[in-house]
Amino acid sequence: MDIFRILSRGAALKRSSNSDPGVKSESQNATKDKQNSLLRQVEKETDFFNTRKHTEVTKDIEDEAQDEAVPPPKITTEEDAAKLRKQNKVNVSGTDIPLPIGSFEDLIARCNLNRKLLANLIASGYSEPTAIQCEAIPASAEGRDLIACAPTGSGKTLAYLIPMAQALISSPKTKNYGIRGVVIAPTNELAIQIYQTLAPMCRGSNLNVTLLSKQVASKISSSIISANKFDVLICTPLRLIDLVKKEQVDLSKVEHLVIDEADKLFDHGFVEQTDEILSHCTLPTRRTSMFSATIPSGVEEMANSIMKDQIRIIVGHKEGASTSIDQKLVFTGNEEGKLLAIRQMVQQGEFKPPIIIFLQSIPRAKALFHELIYDKLNVEVIHAERTPKQREEAIRRFKNGDAWVLITTDVLARGVDFKGVNLVINYDVPQTSQAYVHRIGRTGRGGKEGKAVTFFTKEDKLAIKPVLNVMKQSGCHEGYSEWMESMEKLTKKEKQQIKQHEIKRKKISTVPQVVSKKRKQRKEMIEASKRRKEETK
């Protein structure tokens, strides 16, 4: 797609929408020089790679840009839409559903997409919309509430950021008007990633976005800066609630509210915080969007209670994993067998970095970290007991390739995008199918292939059933033994039992084999010395 041709077309679109093409008004003639100046400025600002000379925009080029019409959208009929949805395995429900888009270029004609926003998208490497973006962007652009479910790594973040940014940029307010957009995420790591996606998109626009980090929250709390200077706030729930209760953040003007990882934010431990935020977002015309890779029926019921005239978008299965992930269940017998399985994978060349390993608790994550350190593997660890700075440093080292393996708990299972993760290992079986989908979603992102291996022991006979169901839905029938085909689904009581009670597991040995051997040798030497002393008496 030629960004420079598209940006030129934008001028023609604006002119035709505001005037009669057959009549030139005095105001048009008076502003012609100004338009030429703006076109020259756009030429300069969109020369991202310094390959284009900033020359004078001649009359011939201007006339060509003005006369060239924007091509019609790729999707123009319900038949086109049905064909695209079938191809992308998308199910959309609701009333008066907008047609999907077939390309980002369609947004120029259908939504009058801001030229600077489009230029920034192209500069960031986005070329064609994904399945969720094709549906969610036009629906959001028309001001509809959304419940959207799509596999991990399918581009959900961009699906809600583009329409929010477009809406806010195209209707600017006075300086220090107040917060107009809020994106809530369950973890700090995910909030950082969302900010890092939005900030480059809004570069050069009138939109002021910020991440509500500890430092920013402290400055707002101390009245060093005013929260009203920001248009969009990206945050975790508790930090926002703290400032709202102190009356230092006003959410009454929020026009766009996005709840990312909605299943987590409406689960126990978060639902009260989410409700608190919703109660302060009082603007009657507020648009609410909820996105996640898994949306259980209970969460959907709560979502329906706070939305109006919403559209429901499901890409693939409602609780399914990406089909680009090769999933496998490995029986290890016992806890010791898990360590042996990892060492065997290393010996057989299956342990190909970058790799993420998930465990069920912080003590177990620490223990495995020390075990693999003494196995001379290049590893890092992230869990809730580490400081934000330590966690950021661990993520930085992993992304840069300084660490090959990242050991973590479910704190890192949601939303965080790591490019090119080859393998995810579930050292401990997750407690729910949702947790499993989010964990393995760290690989196979953006359509790339990935691999996920889940270790299980005889204690996991119930816990592996939800994992097995996800594997069947994803078509990974070769990843488990034939006898598992006949396993019955969990009862409601069994699901609650697994979710509420962690499986008690034996402690992972943190004593490396070499240290254990030296200790044994020393003990034998001491005992031999004692015997010699006894014999000489």
Curated annotation (Swiss-Prot):
Span(s) of short sequence motif DEAD box: 260-263
Family annotation (InterPro entries): DDX52/Rok1_DEADc, DEAD/DEAH_box_helicase_dom, DEAD_box_RNA_helicase, Helicase_ATP-bd, Helicase_C-like, P-loop_NTPase, RNA-helicase_DEAD-box_CS
Positions with a binding annotation for ATP: A150, P151, T152, G153, S154, G155, K156, T157
One Gene Ontology cellular component annotation held by this UniProt entry: nucleolus
Region (Disordered), start-end ranges: 14-51, 512-537
GO biological process: maturation of SSU-rRNA
One example GO MF annotation: RNA binding
Helicase C-terminal domain mapped to chain residues: 324-488
Start-end of Basic and acidic residues biased regions: 31-47, 523-537
Secreted found in the keyword field: no
Short motif Q motif, span: 106-134
Compartments reported by the entry: Nucleus, Nucleolus
Keyword rRNA processing: yes
Catalysed reactions listed for this entry: ATP + H2O = ADP + phosphate + H(+)
Bias type Polar residues, positions: 15-30
Helicase ATP-binding domain segment(s): 137-313
EC number of the protein: 3.6.4.13
Subcellular location, principal: nucleus
Keywords linked to the UniProt accession: ATP-binding, Helicase, Hydrolase, Nucleotide-binding, Nucleus, Ribosome biogenesis, RNA-binding, rRNA processing
Assembly and oligomerization: Interacts with the U3 snoRNA and is associated with the 90S and 40S pre-ribosomes.
Family note: Belongs to the DEAD box helicase family. DDX52/ROK1 subfamily.
Domain characteristics, as noted in the entry: The Q motif is unique to and characteristic of the DEAD box family of RNA helicases and controls ATP binding and hydrolysis.
Protein name according to UniProt: ATP-dependent RNA helicase ROK1
Species, as recorded: Meyerozyma guilliermondii (strain ATCC 6260 / CBS 566 / DSM 6381 / JCM 1539 / NBRC 10279 / NRRL Y-324) (Yeast)
